[in-house]
Regions:
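Transmembrane-helix signature of polytopic, membrane-embedded enzymes
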Residues: 86-107, 121-122
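Extracytoplasmic catalytic/substrate-binding loops of multi-pass membrane glycan-assembly enzymes
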Residues: 24-38, 47-61, 71, 211-217, ...
Length: 458
């Protein structure tokens, strides 16, 4: 297919990244978004190292231009897509493959939602570029060492799991150390390992001296062992979904209908696992390609380490978001290999278009004008003073539910989307605008005048 069609698709991707989030009911604001914003607002007097400072710091920098943390975070997401696409095109760095990659579920989810994974994937992309230049164009010396080491630091400053990618290059180095074809790369690669390790260790030391913990481990919840059986099942399903570039549906509760959906999705996951396996089995030249082997080792290392982390820390279940950093190098390596093969390129192009449209629609679910609601809520709180808390006091009111109809069998079921409830959305808008306000889970504050109640927001 002509490059022009990929350019058009990229512009569609960029257009979607700019406008689609405005029609998502919650605007892309999730619980972690509020944590990032609170950290950003507290700079330089930061009290927590639960999250690294990189993403909140950039939010704070853009806040000086927008005076609105929501739009600051949204600009970061848009710029990530813009820079990746423009850089790929002008540097001729796998442009077609990059456009396909930007259509996968991980980028749609991580860009439309205001989370640090979007920025992380962007930094990871540029890191891969430098390694590719190092292996294929003999880019050596400090022109490779310094930017690569700084990108490793940027990964770690964005997400602590960036250390998993650092561990991946250690494994990559050990695997290839004795290979004759790796001889010319040893010295510079080793210097990158040392310098990057120094940068990461320096930030860990900063955290330890200022917060008493290296990577926020002393501020995380302990592992809930009461539901370990269900957690294992859900995490297993999440891992099996890692190789699926299109579908990442994850119901919050198990019902007879959602179990059927999970079984159907599981079968599709198996198909994608087989297709990727067959792709690599048929094209064995990848074994001598350092870029692809680096991507695969990064994917596998990240997956293993995040699974281990899940069983020792109270982090999220292994869903699309948590596994995006593992899916990313796997997808990119498979897409590169696909384009190097004699397969019909129209197939992957139209699958990418479908993925973009489907995942955008999946996140929207029920189209709403988030920016309009944001303006309405902010107008109601603009003159409120001495407010310190937000509390949802209408939890007993029937929550909004969406009806889903199943074709063929002519059945329907209702599903309650937690992030589409009015009180939840309003609370996120309020706290993102006024980070000094804290969310109350229980109405325990005696001074009711300091509380914004959800029932007060019309």
């Amino acid at each position: 297919m002509s490059e022009k069609k990929y350019i058009y698709l990229y512009f569609a991707i960029l257009f979607f990244a700019i406008f689609i989030p405005s029609f998502i009911s919650y605007g892309g604001i999730v619980a972690d978004t509020l944590s990032y914003i609170k950290i950003a607002d507290s700079i330089p007097d930061v009290k927590s190292n639960l999250f690294p400072l990189g993403y909140p710091l950039i939010i704070r920098l853009f806040h000086s231009l927008t005076d609105d943390y929501y739009f600051s975070a949204r600009i970061i997401s848009i710029l990530t897509v813009l820079l990746i696409g423009v850089f790929s095109y002008f540097k001729k760095f796998f442009f077609k493959e990059t456009v396909i990659l930007l259509c996968t579920k991980i980028f749609v989810f991580c860009i439309y939602n205001l989370i640090s994974e979007g920025l992380f994937l962007g930094i990871f992309y540029f890191l891969i570029y430098y390694f590719h230049e190092f292996f294929t164009k003999n880019k050596k010396g400090w022109s490779f060492i310094l930017p690569t080491s700084l990108l490793f630091l940027a990964l770690f400053l964005t997400r602590y799991s960036g250390i998993f990618i650092y561990i991946a290059i250690l494994i990559f180095f050990l695997i290839n150390y004795r290979k004759p074809t790796f001889k010319n790369y040893k010295k510079d690669f080793f210097v990158v390992i040392i310098l990057s390790g120094f940068f990461l260790a320096s930030y860990m030391l900063y955290n330890f001296l200022n917060f008493g913990g290296i990577m926020g481990e002393n501020e995380r919840f302990s592992v809930d062992k009461t539901s370990i059986g269900l957690d294992i099942i859900r995490n297993f399903l999440g891992v099996m979904n890692l190789a699926n570039p299109i579908l990442g549906i994850k119901p919050a509760h198990f019902t007879s209908i959602t179990i059927i959906i999970e079984i159907f999705l599981f079968l599709i996951n198996l198909i994608f696992i087989y297709l990727i396996y067959h792709l690599f089995k048929k094209n064995k030249k990848w074994k001598s390609d350092f870029t692809i082997t680096f991507l695969l080792i990064s994917s596998a290392t990240y997956l293993v380490l995040v699974i281990i982390s899940k069983f020792f820390q109270g982090i999220e279940e292994l869903n699309t978001r948590m596994l995006s950093e593992s899916s990313f190098p796997l997808f990119l390596s498979a897409i590169i290999l696909y384009f190097q093969s004699d397969y019909n390129k129209k197939i992957i192009f139209y699958l990418a278009v479908f993925s973009l449209l489907f995942n955008a629609a999946y996140l929207i679910k029920i189209p709403q004008n988030f920016l309009k609601r944001k303006a309405e809520v902010e107008n109601q709180i603009v003159n409120l003073k001495d407010k310190k808390y937000y509390f949802d006091n209408i939890k007993n009111v029937e929550k909004s539910r969406k009806e889903y109809k199943i074709p063929i069998i002519n059945k329907s079921f209702y599903y309650e989307h937690g992030n589409q409830q009015k009180a939840y959305i309003d609370g996120n808008i309020i706290i993102s605008r006024k980070p000094e306000i804290n969310l109350l889970l229980k109405d325990t504050v005696k001074n009711k005048k300091s509380v914004i109640f959800s029932s007060d927001i019309k």
